[in-house]
Amino acid sequence: MQKALKLGSFFARSAISVKPTLATSKMTQLRHFSHGASVFDIDSVEDFTEKVIQSSVPVIVDFHAEWCGPCQALGPRLEEKVNGRQGSVLLAKINVDHAGELAMDYGISAVPTVFAFKNGEKISGFSGVLDDEQLDDFIEDVLAA
């Protein structure tokens, strides 16, 4: 049912790493400002603790990479669905190439990997790309938990 892009433990063993360039930094900055009010980027463990763990509403966390085709397919659809929920759920975007410590802390070995947090606890998740109906069901389950 769930398809995953298996990349091995590319963070923990430094097998693959993308170095930010001026072009990708500018892309990230532009994309950052295109998020809706319910979507934000996470760049550090401190940021994660403040915006995800301490959040009073459920937060969906999207571990992704700029070079990942499935991530590029999932990310905008997930953003659109979360933005359509008028703040009842938030979306935190974590670029694994810029926040490797968080990726290692959560055992990310494939991207995209998505987790849901509620009241500071991880409650569910998936790896790979889901269709629109599956995404809607996932968000509904997060809200109902």
Swiss-Prot record:
Q: Where is this site: Deprotonates C-terminal active site Cys?
A: 62
The Thioredoxin domain extends over 39-144
Site feature (Contributes to redox potential value) residues: 69-70
GO biological process, any: cell redox homeostasis
Record bears the keyword Disulfide bond: yes
- Judging by the UniProt lineage, the source's domain of life is Eukaryota
Which residues catalyse the reaction?
Answer: 68, 71
InterPro entries, alphabetically?
Thioredoxin-like_sf, Thioredoxin_CS, Thioredoxin_domain
* Gene Ontology CC, one term: mitochondrion
Q: Which UniProt keywords apply?
A: Disulfide bond, Electron transport, Redox-active center, Transport
Q: List the disulfide bonds.
A: 68-71
The record describes the protein's role as:
Participates in various redox reactions through the reversible oxidation of its active center dithiol to a disulfide and catalyzes dithiol-disulfide exchange reactions.
Please give the family membership noted in the entry.
Belongs to the thioredoxin family.
PANTHER family documented for this protein? THIOREDOXIN, MITOCHONDRIAL (PTHR43601:SF3)
Protein name as it appears in the record = Probable thioredoxin-2
Q: Per the UniProt entry, what species is this protein from, by scientific name?
A: Caenorhabditis elegans
Recall the taxonomic lineage recorded for the source organism.
Answer: Eukaryota, Metazoa, Ecdysozoa, Nematoda, Chromadorea
